[in-house]
Every structure is written in C-alpha cells, then in structure tokens.
C-alpha cells in the first residue's frame, strides 16, 4: 500500500441473532437472547473492542443502550462492570433526524445523509467503529454496504417471527469467515468480513 494512502477505519456490526435470522421479536422482544457473561465471553469482548474508539447508534437504540450500561457501571460487583465502563467512556455518535443536539454525555449527533456521514467518519483518523443491534439502523447500513465486519452471536433459538437486518438487500452479498467460537451457552460467534469484489 502507498505509505501516503491511509487505511479506512473499519465499521463492525455486533449483534445477537436467532438461528432463523431475527435480532428481535416483532415488538423488539429480546428475552430469548442468552448472553451469559463468563470469562471466555469477557475475554473475547475485550479483544473485539480493544481497537474500537467510536460507537455509532441509531436514535431508537440510544436511550436503551446508554441507560443499560450506565446502570451496570454503577454496580461494581456486576460481572459486566469493566465492559460497561468502556461502553460509557467510548465516544458515541447518534444518527437522528429528530434531534439537533445531544441529550447524553460523551455523545455527538449526526443528522446528514447516512452514507455520506459514515464514509466521512471512516476516512478520519482513529480506531475502529462499532455498531450494535438496531434493526432499521443496521438494515440501512447493510443496504448501503457500509459494514466491513460482522460479529454475529448466533443464539440456539428460533423465534419464528421477528425483526431482521438483511431483508433490504437487493443483491447477493458474500463474506469470508474469519473466526468461529462456540460458547458454553450454545451461542456461536461467527466473525465475517465482507468479500471485496
């Protein structure tokens, strides 16, 4: 690679998904997700998030995300405590058309065209960028082919009817498998990168 040409930042999707391809029930139910926090999962999450310095969120997901991790961070005995600290301290960008300024600490607002904003963000100096579950937001990112790596935590459950993230694709997308890890809960992590043409 040309030394003068810097690499783009990677955008990673981190999501729990059922074996029938749903990330939430029809009314956003998530009680079927098993994310048992043990040493193996903690070590993996720490490794995954180590190069990440920006979190992006859709507006609908933001309150829930920040509220959950803020509550965990206030419980030092919680096994997720150290991870929660990283979630709260990592700068966040919320994509919204309804807000002009942030309601949350350590958070900026992005109101422009999604594709333009993400391309601009990926071209800036910095570490990797990560996005979490949010069916409509994730679907938009996937449709625009903006996600570089997928971290799919396949839960051993089929829910039959729910919200998916690949339904808006208009063409076949192919991926390279980078890693797979089975956890004691039966959840399997599949780490894919988008296959370049």
Which functions belong to the PLM regions below?
Residues 2-197:
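Enzymes that bind and transform nitrogen-containing heteroaromatic metabolites
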């Amino acid at each position: 690679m040309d030394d003068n040409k810097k690499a783009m930042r990677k955008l990673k999707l981190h999501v729990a998904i059922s074996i029938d391809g749903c990330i939430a029930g029809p009314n956003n139910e998530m009680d079927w997700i098993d994310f048992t926090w043990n040493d193996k999962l903690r070590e993996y999450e720490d490794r995954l998030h180590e190069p990440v310095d920006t979190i992006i969120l859709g507006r609908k997901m933001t309150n829930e995300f920040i509220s959950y991790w803020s509550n965990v961070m206030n419980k030092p005995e919680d096994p997720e405590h150290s991870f929660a600290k990283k979630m709260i301290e990592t700068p966040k960008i919320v994509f919204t058309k309804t807000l002009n300024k942030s309601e949350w600490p350590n958070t900026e607002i992005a109101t422009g065209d999604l594709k333009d904003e993400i391309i601009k963000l990926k071209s800036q100096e910095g570490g990797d960028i990560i996005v979490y579950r949010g069916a409509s937001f994730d679907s938009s990112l996937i449709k625009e082919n903006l996600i570089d790596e997928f971290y799919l935590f396949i839960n051993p459950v089929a829910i039959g009817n729910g919200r998916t993230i690949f339904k808006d694709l208009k063409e076949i997308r192919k991926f390279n498998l980078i890693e797979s890890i089975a956890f004691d809960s039966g959840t399997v992590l599949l780490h894919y990168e988008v296959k370049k043409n």
